[in-house]
Swiss-Prot record:
The gene is pssY. InterPro entries: Bact_transf. This is UDP-glucose:undecaprenyl-phosphate glucose-1-phosphate transferase. Complements colanic acid (CA) synthesis in the E.coli mutant lacking wcaJ. Can also partially complement the O-antigen defect in the S.typhimurium wbaP deletion strain. The keyword Phosphoprotein does not apply. It catalyses: di-trans,octa-cis-undecaprenyl phosphate + UDP-alpha-D-glucose = alpha-D-glucosyl di-trans,octa-cis-undecaprenyl diphosphate + UMP.
Amino acid sequence: MKEQGLPAVNIIACASPLLCTTTSSDCVSVWACELEQPLSDALGKLKDHPVDLGPSTQLLTLRPGGPLPRVAVDLRKRVLDVVAAALLTALFAPLLLLAALAIKLESPGPALFRQTRGGLGGAPFQILKLRTMHCREDGPDVAQAQRGDDRVTRVGRILRAASIDELPQLLNVLRGDMSLVGPRPHATAHDDYYSARIPEYAARYQARPGLTGLAQVRGLRGGTETVELMRQRIAADIDYIQTWSLWRDLKIVLRTVPSLLTTDNAY
């Protein structure tokens, strides 16, 4: 609610100390972690704003400095990542070399594309991809590729349709930046945009980003032109983090192969 021209305050998680806030034109959403002091102390910090309290069933509680979920620390997952990534890198090495040569022959510039993405805990890392566009974009104005995007090269369209451009991320897996399965990492500009509009967005940082994920095998692959599409992807990411198991990882990997045979959302 709004009173006397002040924005309303929505306590998303009844806890303290305050973790972070997100704002919109008419609401301040307050996130918090563990209840370590009386709720009245937390509300005292908001004394200049009218306050509405309400439960949230969507928020996956963030625990700064606390234990990470199993998906982030299970040794079996890391062993599977390293062994599988090493084997796949050796298997696809000839294909990657041919793709890199085709990229260099078609357009000037490097064969590899590097971009900052958010990893485990939101820590930045440099993601690796085969370059599929004529120009390199980064920063606050980075734009997602659209169907018929004239920035994408002819070779790039082939690589993107079969997700071959993502194969260099096997090196990210070997380095520990990523996992075979997990939430797909987004450009930092997109992280900033969607985290301001989706309160539970940051929960996806509780797992290493993946080459593939539950959202992708559910058909949520490709661009996210609307906030609602991103909400669906985030819901799948949180579902994966909360219900992770090694067996589920294996099933997602197996389901990824047939999902690559359709190019409906690959452009």
